[in-house]
Structures are given as C-alpha cells and as structure tokens.
Amino acid sequence: MAWTNNVLRVNLTDGTCASEPLNTEWAKKYLGSRGLATKYYVEECDPKVDPLSADNKLIFATGPLTGTAAPTSGRWTVITKGPLTGAIACSNSGGFFGAELKNAGWDMVIFEGKSAGPVYLDINNDKAELK
C-alpha cells in the first residue's frame, strides 16, 4: 500500500477537517508510523506545551506497510505529550483501524485545538467531518 500522501487535520476548536499533503521527505527520512508522527509532533508543538491544553496535539499515524499482507502490518501509532511525565507519549496498537484509515485515503490524523463539547470524527472514505 505504501503512502496515500494525505494527512487529515482536525481542528476541534473550529470544527473543521482539512486534507493536506503528507510531507514525503519526512516520510522517507522517518520511516514508519512512530518516527513520522514524532517528527510532525516536534515540528508543530512547543516543547513546553501543557499536555492538557488546546495547544497540545494528538496524532494517529500509519506506516507504509499498514494495510498490506506483510507481517505485523496492522500496527498504528498514537503520539502526544503525556500529562504524567510531560514527555512525548507513544502508544502502538494493532487491529483493523490502521488499515481502514489507510483504505479511506489517510496516512495520518492530526487532532488540534479543543472542542466546546463532545464531538466525534466521522470518516467515510475520503470524506471526514466532526459530528
């Protein structure tokens, strides 16, 4: 499957979802979901950001093999700054989410801002909206 070359940016404050191109230079240099998501995080967030503030980001990322038949290709990563340690926190999971995200046309979802109330992200193929 490789890369779809699309990043979904979800602004919870504005209630908007926008597609942007994947930084392919970073994708080549920081291969894999963890490396690429971490690169996006450190480039976009102030190192002193409060983990519980609207300025912190939450990044869901897939790798180039996600959704293929390769062994362990069902893995995907979540990166943010954790409130417990104040450091970058990384979680890795398996299952169908990563492959489904990739099949919908997205390599990564970046959540930013803070919503006024509870919302959820509805992804239907290449369309995404907050409800």
Label the model's feature ranges.
Residues 1-131:
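Acidic carboxylate diad motif detector
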